[in-house]
Amino acid sequence: MSTDEERIYSIALTQIPGVGHIGAKRLVDGMGSATDVFRYRTELPDRLPGVNRAVVAALDSPQALKRAEQEYEFARNNRISCFTLADEDYPSRLRECDDAPVVLFFKGKANLNALHIINMVGTRNATDYGKHICVSFLQELQMQCPDVLVVSGLAYGIDINAHRSALSVELPTVGVLAHGLDRIYPSLHRKTAIDMLRQGGLLTEFLSGTNPDKHNFISRNRIVAGISDATIVVESAAKGGSLITADIAGSYHRDCFAFPGRINDEYSKGCNRLIRDNKASLLLSAEDLVHAMGWNIPATFSGKVNVQRSLFPDLSEEEQKIVSILEK
């Protein structure tokens, strides 16, 4: 569990120029905490090969610490959780990634370490076909795997339809933002975002006041991929942000799936190519996903045990003990 000091130093580390996502995580992992990265910064070149003097000099930054203190105060005043790599509530799947954020801001009720987590992404120009997939797929998934958490990016198109479809079947859903938690972008999705706070939440690595600039969306996509067991591309043109998310998921060695479409449909070309190039598995139903991920194994095993017991309804107490031992 992090202290307030560790949270402030973790935020400050994100404000140091020239460090980057991979560098920041490497520093924290190598020193054991963001606090020690700053406290023992002059020792970094000796303790962590590859760290240069420019980074050491940049870490001597009262401005970064002041900005971090302001942001932490903003988070506390607005009941925003601040998770560092040391926190149990930090997404464990994301922590495994080399470029995981050293700090995350979260508002909501979802468990970011839920047993099963998927993300659903796709084009901002969702067709009726894509919208129907979001609804029907999550309806079916809710019946087969009711504990799944649905992640997306709150953007136009497939993203917002995935969130709304999850809400409609009472699945928790988390939106990963490309800006701070002082705003909702696009503003048209504010009502859905508010609903998500009661049944999911909003997550970001960005400080308040950060604009939703183009490069932030790529950073956002790595969180979407890294927090999930599986990435599902619903619809995509030949080029698009969801294909970047799929590539990132592949680099993390996470499962990726795509729904196929007609070969001449503009917003199925990306999905069809992912499947053709073996970058994604073909997905036709929620049952396909549950089977591919092995999420149905415990239930199947349990069913076999129940069948075995029903074959021997009149066992003695001693015989029942033997059966119980064999089941273990």
Identify the residue ranges that each predicted region occupies:
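Glycine-biased, small-residue-rich flexible motifs in mid-sequence functional cores and linkers
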Residues: 2-4, 84-328
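Short, small/acidic-rich helices and loops at N termini and domain boundaries
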Residues: 1-89
